[in-house]
């Protein structure tokens, strides 16, 4: 696996993006709200900074992890993802709609996981 998609830019989605980016994976994070995406990237940057300050992560690795995260509002961004992790709000109707819109954009061999 090289590319991971994350649906939802809340606490869980940003955490998943953080861990995957530090692990060396390219991350595509999608949310319906640009503001949520901006907050998520700022949170990841803050948390990576804390890891760096504590000596848990080199500064070069922090910058590299941040560079691996891209954001957007269109599910088409997941077209080349090997795995897409759904971390949207805990509402069954929302989740059904997410999957309905997501599936047409995925490769036939892509995996889908839900949080």
Predicted feature locations:
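NAD(P)+-binding Rossmann beta1-loop-alpha1 motif at the extreme N-terminus of oxidoreductases
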Residues: 1-50, 54
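Structural motif
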Residues: 7, 15, 30, 72, ...
């Amino acid at each position: 696996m090289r590319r991971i998609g994350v649906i939802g830019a809340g606490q869980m989605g940003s955490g998943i993006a953080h861990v995957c980016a530090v692990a060396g994976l390219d991350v595509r994070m999608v949310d319906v709200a640009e503001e949520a995406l901006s907050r998520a990237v700022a949170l990841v940057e803050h948390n990576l900074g804390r890891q760096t300050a504590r000596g848990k992560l080199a500064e070069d690795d922090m910058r590299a992890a941040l560079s691996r995260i891209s954001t957007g509002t269109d599910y088409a961004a997941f077209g080349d993802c090997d795995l897409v992790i759904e971390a949207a709000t805990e509402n069954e109707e929302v989740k059904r709609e997410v999957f309905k819109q997501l599936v047409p954009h995925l490769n036939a061999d892509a995996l889908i996981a839900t949080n």
